[in-house]
């Protein structure tokens, strides 16, 4: 049950990215006070965001903003991740990376709940609701 877990262990990302558009990509990551996270460089590389670290979020494309928001979710290291349409706005490469991230989180025995109109290859139980 979740009754004994603190709210810090649950991470939700809705259809709005919850980014501070007047700050840079790095500033948005630093707001989370994660310290020196080993995974950060790897995630930035995989999501092709390294070259945008000093760019103001308002100058990033929708897809880049989405990747940044998802990056913050994974750096948060929560036991339960809830995502609303995480694949919207992502190109094929980012879709593949996100699928890999999600499967990696499931391999770490985390729980994942998400909605999607876009097909994905997640290694877990999937409930499809017919139209």
Question: Language model features by range: what are they?
Answer:
Residues 37-52:
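Conserved ABC ATPase "signature" region
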Residues 8-17:
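ABC nucleotide-binding domain signature
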Residues 16, 21-39:
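Q-loop/switch helix immediately C-terminal to the Walker
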């Amino acid at each position: 049950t979740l009754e004994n877990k603190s709210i810090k262990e649950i991470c939700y990302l809705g259809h709005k990215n919850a980014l501070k558009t007047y700050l840079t990509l790095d500033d948005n990551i630093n707001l989370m006070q994660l310290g020196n996270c080993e995974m950060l460089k790897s995630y930035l590389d995989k999501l092709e965001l390294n070259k945008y670290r000093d760019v103001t979020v308002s100058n990033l494309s929708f897809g880049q903003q989405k990747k940044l928001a998802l990056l913050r979710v994974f750096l948060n290291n929560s036991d339960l991740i809830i995502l609303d349409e995480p694949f919207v706005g992502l190109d094929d490469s980012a879709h593949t990376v996100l699928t890999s991230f999600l499967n990696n989180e499931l391999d770490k025995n985390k729980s994942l709940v998400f909605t999607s109109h876009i097909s994905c290859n997640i290694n877990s139980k999937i409930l499809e609701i017919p139209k």
